[in-house]
Amino acid sequence: MIVPIELAHTKNITYDITIDALPQLTFDTKVAVVTNPTVAGYHLQTLLAHIKAPQLEVITVPDGEEYKTLETVETILNELFEHKFDRKSLLIAFGGGVIGDMTGFTASLYQRGIDFIQIPTTLLSQVDASVGGKTGVNNRYGKNLIGAFYQPKAVYIDPAFLKTLPSREFSAGVAEIIKMAVMFDKDYFEFLVTADLSDEEVLKETIRRSVELKAWVVNQDEKEAGIRAVLNYGHTFGHVVENETGYTTYLHGEAVAIGMVMANALAVELGLLGETEADRIKALLEKASLPTHYTIKDVDDFYEHFFLDKKSANNSIKFILPEGIGGHKIVSDIDESVVKNVLKKFEEEV
């Protein structure tokens, strides 16, 4: 199954997202696989058996969001220099969203840009992070504040890699699936309410529908000038949760789930979402074993973090909110007191 990326406003950038068993990959240039010890332990030998290249290197970096930094990117760059990679060389991102983001960003920097491909191994990266060309790293001010839009040459999604994924990581990926359904497709939401994702065929169908939705958005708006910003539902709040907890307490998808609950509370306050709809979304998140509670220690500090969000501009915060299930609205003129009153509801767990 192939989902095409054909960027509407960018000349000559097209590539395929292949959802199937990993094919044999043959290259006529130097190739470096960037991965982490966890993925390497389970799947590296399988990947290497599928690659033919005149020179093949493996670069292993530490596992975890806390290592998604400029320092780690510099480590990868130095390895490429050590192995005398050139502008025709290729990187392969083999791992989850952290590996994909850092590998893509490294590819954008090395000698002003070399090719890379994505082979995602987590549900979150298969349905979301590997699709669309967002790359980057975190710093002490916030998440993904340093980065670039840099498209891969191809994406290969093999659901078989998910068989070794811990249940918590799997749930984190489901958060991004629910996000897309709430924003764009009520029928898909209803499908997810009853879907058994432990069934391989149901899971493959879920991956397909999610990738098609993401590709549909990216094809219209590569650089988040419009509709692509809607994919940040849950992220404005979720990124603050991640930052406040040092990127070590919650997986990204878990923080997004909490952020969705917070965004829903604001949407209910503004009359965009009914209480019953908010409860249904929360129930679906809980069905996926995702956290839906977070205690805000200081509402003022939490609010100030919003201004470090990439979507904020001219001292205005853009909130991505559901307008019913299957609809969305971007709102940037909400009075500070309204937002803070909603945040106060999370000073004690709801």
UniProtKB/Swiss-Prot annotation:
Binds 1 divalent metal cation per subunit. Can use either Co(2+) or Zn(2+). Coiled coil: none annotated. The gene is aroB. It is found in: Cytoplasm. This is 3-dehydroquinate synthase. Its main location: cytoplasm. Belongs to the sugar phosphate cyclases superfamily. Dehydroquinate synthase family. Its EC number is 4.2.3.4. It comes from Sulfurovum sp. (strain NBC37-1). Keywords: Amino-acid biosynthesis, Aromatic amino acid biosynthesis, Cobalt, Cytoplasm, Lyase, Metal-binding, NAD, Nucleotide-binding, Zinc. NAD(+) binds at residues 63-68, 97-101, 121-122, 134, 143, 161-164. InterPro entries: Dehydroquinate_synthase, DHQ_synth_AroB, DHQ_synth_fam, DHQS/DOIS_N, DHQS_C.
